[in-house]
Amino acid sequence: MALTFTSYKNQTNDVLQRGIVNTVARTSDLLAEIPVEKVDSLLYRYNTTDYNQTLSFVDAGEGFENTDVEAQAVILELKHMGTYADVPLQMVRGGNVADLRANVTEVKTENFAKNLEEKIFYADGTSKGFKGFDQFIKDGIGTKVEKAISYDALCEVVDAVPNASAIYMNRKTLRAVEKAIKTEGYTFGNVTTEGGKLVKAFNEVAIFPTETIKDNEIFVLEYSTSGCGLLVCGDLINTTDMGLLENQPIYRTMIEGSYAPIVRQKGAIAKLEVPMLRTAKK
């Protein structure tokens, strides 16, 4: 089983960290499901491939045909992000310190998860060099389909990712898609995720609604060692209870991590861009 935020929450013995990891996984379906790969450096170099090599049978004693696989070298730079969960001392007087800090930390962690998810999808590489899935597609690593919503359009974008693991869209788009395919005589099915969550599915690919995705876009991702993932330098998420600061009347918890999305081959990601959320005419 691949390392994810969902699986990691059961692997750490740190109570604070376990709670924060659990909040991240609960807040973001993307972070709950995406496979995480730990690396030892903030720079990571790899090659993306354009196609899989085709092999043929040969007679005994014959040599094998050597077919070159086109590849593109990519260098990713992991970027550091974090936040402080601060509780001023004056808020604590007469209250429960632990409860107040827990509440603030949960809110800050939810914000951390939402911001990280948004960057994983849409960071354009200009801000600190962090490149999201949308930019990978713009750079030619992935497939873009521009069509009105229809059953065939959904099939096309899902088929562009042969081993698709997940579909992401916001709730407005999901309602439009569900309405459109229903008029064509189709409905969504249901599947259970590795985390035990029952979700809608299209062609047995899990659908995760998230308000991070723009109104007119649908992303399809493959989660595997040769597909999409998230690089992490160090721990999946680092948490430090700094206690009451010496120079400020503040109780502080620090939440941080170093990340970079990765797409290892073109067939691992696709996006359906729907003009003005129109549905296809029958």
Q: PLM features: residue spans?
A:
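Extended, non-catalytic structural segments that build the interaction scaffolds
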Residues: S56-F57, M91-A98, N103
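Glycine-centered loop/turn motifs
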Residues: A60-F64, D215-I218
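Sequence/fold signature of self-assembling virion shell proteins
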Residues: A2-Y51, E70-M81, G95-A98, K131-C155, ...
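Conserved hydrophobic ligand-interaction patch in extracellular adhesion modules
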Residues: I167-N170
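Residues forming anionic-ligand binding surfaces in small-molecule and nucleic-acid pockets
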Residues: M81-Q90
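Short, glycine/acidic-rich hinge or "gate" loops at secondary-structure transitions
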Residues: E117-G132
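Solvent-exposed, polar/charged alpha-helical surfaces in well-ordered, non-transmembrane soluble domains
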Residues: A102, E106, E110, Y151-C155
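Sec-exported extracytoplasmic/periplasmic mature domains
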Residues: T109-E117
